[in-house]
Swiss-Prot record:
Molecular functions (GO terms): rRNA binding; structural constituent of ribosome
Alphabetic keyword roster: Ribonucleoprotein, Ribosomal protein, RNA-binding, rRNA-binding
Name of the featured protein: Small ribosomal subunit protein uS19
Summary of the function given for this chain in its UniProt record: Protein S19 forms a complex with S13 that binds strongly to the 16S ribosomal RNA.
Gene label: rpsS
Length: 91
């Protein structure tokens, strides 16, 4: 279920301030963030965010197609290495 339209999209205030400061100076630094819950705004296009996945910061370059999604969608938290193979079938 999505967020109510009357509430509007959510973005952490500190993250928005950082992006606005980068846009004012036309700087393209990597923005390190733990805010996986923040919605991607059109102001974020062209910036790279280092989104924390619980272990490390994953670089996420924001493009036009990502607007409206959350930052956490592009930094997976779980690593799946597959099920254990049956030793009898490998011989």
């Amino acid at each position: 279920m999505g967020r109510s339209l009357k509430k509007g999209p959510f973005v952490d205030g500190h993250l928005m301030k950082k992006v606005e400061a980068l846009n004012a100076t036309n700087d393209k630094k990597v923005v390190k963030t733990w805010s996986r819950r923040s919605t991607i705004f059109p102001d974020f296009i062209g910036h790279t965010f280092a989104v924390y996945d619980g272990r490390k910061h994953v670089p996420v370059y924001v493009s036009e197609d990502m607007v409206g999604h959350k930052l956490g969608e592009f930094a997976p938290t779980r690593t799946y290495k597959g099920h254990a193979a049956d030793k009898k079938t490998r011989r």
